[in-house]
C-alpha cells in the first residue's frame, strides 16, 4: 500500500498540476478528490501546454488510471468539452474513471452563483461563477443530483423537475430573474450523461483495490489549503476541503491508507479573487513578479494578486494538512531581484504572532514581519541540482524549508517537467 497526496499550500495556482504530472510518472492510479471545473491546472509536455479543469493530470499517461472521485462536483458540459479537447490533441481518455457518487453541476447552479455574487455588492468573495458553491449547497441539503442519477432517465427527470421548480421560484421571487426551461436542460444534460457513461463506475472500489494490491496511488487536490472551507480564509474560500483530510471523504479511501502528503508552494505567494493577503505587493516588484510569473488565472484569466513568501501561511498549511514533504516552485521568477523577502511572523497591534488568525478583522490589522535575503541575478532555468543554484538562491530554498519546518523534496526552476529537480524521492521514502 503506497499513496501520496498532493495539496496546494497557499491560495491555489501553486503548480500542483505540474507536480502531480511529475509524480504521476511513478504512480499507477491518479485521483482527484474535490473541487470542480473552477480549478485550472496547466501541464507542459515537450514544450506544449495543456490546460485542464476537471480531468486529473494523470490522463497523459495512457497506461495509468485517472479517477474523478465522489468529492468532485462535475459539470457534464465542461467535462464533455474537455474530453473533446484532449481527443483533438491526440490524447486517449480510455483510462478515465468517474465516480457514480459525484454530484452534478447544472445550469441553475451557475445562474444562482452569479445572482448570489451580484447581490453581495462590495462584499463579493470572488467566485469563478462555475456553480461550485450552489452544487455543494444542494449536496449538503440532500437534494443534489449525482452522476448515477444523471444516467437514469426517469430518476434524472424526476429530480431535475423538483429541483428546477424550487430554483425557478427563487430566481423569480427573490432575484427577479428569468426562470430556466426544464426540457432544454433535461435533453442537453441527459445527452451529456450518455456521452460519459462509459467512464462511470464505483471509483472507491478501484482505489481501494489498487492500494490493497500494493499499487502506487496519487491523490490530486484542487485549489489550496488557504481556500479550504474549514481551514482557509473564510468566507473567501471554496466550498470543499482541499486539505489532505478531504481525500478520505472525496475518494472513499480511509485515512489509514494515506502515507505521504506533499505540499506544493511557489517561492512567492499569489491568489485570485478577494480576501486577506498580508504579504500582498502593490509596487513595481509585485508587477514584475506578476508579469515574469505569468500570474493570470487558468480558469478566469484574471490577474492574480502577488506577494512575498509567507511562512505563517505555510506553517498553518503544514499543521492542518499534515504535510510531510514540500515542493517549491517558480524560484526562477525571483531571479533578477536585488533583495528577496520572507514573512516570518505578523505584527498584530504591536504584538508578534506566529499563527494565522481566523478573524478577518485581525487579519486586516496584521503587518508582515520580513526577513530580507540577498537576491540573485543569474538565469537559473537550466539548473538541474541544488548545487547548481547560485549561493543566494540556494540559501533562499534552505531558509524556506527551515521556516516551514518541512523538508523540501523537489524544487522547480520553470514550467517544464525537466525543470523539476528531485532532492528526495517521495515514493522511495515510503
Swiss-Prot record:
Enzyme Commission number: 6.3.4.4
Gene Ontology CC: one annotated term: cytoplasm
MF term (GO), any: GTP binding
Enzyme class, first EC level, given as a word: ligase
GO-annotated biological processes: 'de novo' AMP biosynthetic process; IMP metabolic process
Family label: Belongs to the adenylosuccinate synthetase family.
Subunit record text: Homodimer.
Function summary: Plays an important role in the de novo pathway of purine nucleotide biosynthesis. Catalyzes the first committed step in the biosynthesis of AMP from IMP.
The protein's name: Adenylosuccinate synthetase
Source organism (scientific name): Streptococcus pyogenes serotype M49 (strain NZ131)
Name of the gene encoding the protein in the UniProt record: purA
